[in-house]
Amino acid sequence: QELYGDLYNLEATPAESTAYRLAKHDKARYPDIITAHEGGTPYYTNSSHLPVGYTEDVFAALDVQDKLQTLYTSGTVFHTFLGEKLPSWQSAAALVRKIAENYELPYYTLSPTYSICTEHGYLKGEQKTCPICGKTTEVYSRITGYYRPVQNWNAGKTQEYKERKEYNIGTSVLKHKGPLHPEAKPEQEPAVEEELCKNSTGKRKILFTRE
């Protein structure tokens, strides 16, 4: 930016299809290259996200991701993958607030899996058949930035979905208080030395401060 006068941003690419496509081509050209799901359908972990089977503890994942995602200047997100919707809007609000108060990453989602029956509509969680009529359903999950029926995903994203550990909010443990938490101790202000001068009226005026 200083050299050319142009503006640049650092962005986490979504890679809805390239996570599989590039891994497949790389594996064909370089058989020894490391990809996710060694020995099977290859894919790359999206952007700088954790491996999809890393942990069921959402706060353990956030502890790692918060250090990375705050380095981006645009286009980054942490997806809180849930097996099914939370029991109430109050539960969702409490989780959103806890993340906001204790982490600094700019954007996150609550992403439950759900199913749709053509006869009976919305079903929570992954239910491949309708418990009421027995018809085959469509299971929806967030492929990356948007929801789509899992049956329409490419082979790599389908494998990722199979290996994905969904976060268990009930057993997740927050191990620290972040800077915005109400009980967090405020950082001590640095000692400041004021540089003063007198203006034409004789009043003192602060020119600048320094530590």
Predicted regions and their residues:
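Long, C-terminal-biased catalytic regions of enzyme "large/alpha" subunits
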Residues: 1-186, 193-211
